[in-house]
C-alpha cells in the first residue's frame, strides 16, 4: 500500500511503504512538469534556481543534454520511441529552465496566448508555403521579462 510521506513546497513526493520514490506515472497526476523536474533535481542533488550565465558550465551541460535529446528525437525509429524521445526533450527543456529559476509553465501559457494572436486581418490563419503559421497583423509578442532572473 502506498502512503503519502511528505509534501514539499515545490511538488509532491510520494513514497511506498519502504520509503522509495514512486515510479508509477499515476503518482504524479497533480504535478506540473516544473514540479516534477524540481523533484528530480532535489532527489538527484542537482541544484536549481541559479543565476543564468551564458556559456557557464551548467549552461553548457544543459545545452549538451538538449542536443543529445534532440538527436534522439531525430533518430527515433517508431512512433512509441519518437513519443518517448519528445517527452525526454520536453523534460530536459523544463529542467534547463528550472536550473535558472525560470517558470516554463507560465512562459508556455504566455507563448500560447501570443501564438493565438497570429490570425490575419480576416480572423483566419496565414500560412507559409510549407504550412507554417505566420504572424498576422494582430500578432502580440509574449512578455516574459518578469519571468527571467536578472
Predicted regions located by residue number:
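Flexible "arm" and connector segments at domain edges
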Residues: 4-86, 90-150
Amino acid at each position: 500500500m502506498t502512503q503519502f510521506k511528505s509534501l514539499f513546497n515545490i511538488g509532491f513526493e510520494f513514497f511506498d511503504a519502504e520509503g522509495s520514490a514512486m515510479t508509477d506515472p499515476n503518482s504524479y497526476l497533480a504535478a506540473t512538469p516544473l514540479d516534477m523536474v524540481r523533484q528530480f533535481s532535489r532527489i538527484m542533488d542537482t541544484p536549481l534556481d541559479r543565476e543564468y550565465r551564458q556559456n557557464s558550465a551548467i549552461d553548457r551541460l544543459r545545452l549538451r543534454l538538449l542536443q543529445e535529446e534532440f538527436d534522439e528525437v531525430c533518430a527515433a525509429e517508431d512512433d512509441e520511441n519518437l513519443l518517448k524521445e519528445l517527452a525526454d526533450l520536453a523534460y530536459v527543456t523544463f529542467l534547463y529552465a528550472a536550473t535558472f529559476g525560470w517558470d516554463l509553465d507560465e512562459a508556455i501559457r504566455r507563448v500560447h496566448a501570443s501564438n493565438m494572436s497570429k490570425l490575419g486581418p480576416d480572423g483566419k490563419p496565414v500560412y507559409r508555403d510549407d504550412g507554417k503559421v505566420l504572424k498576422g497583423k494582430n500578432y502580440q509578442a509574449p512578455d516574459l521579462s518578469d519571468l527571467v532572473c536578472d
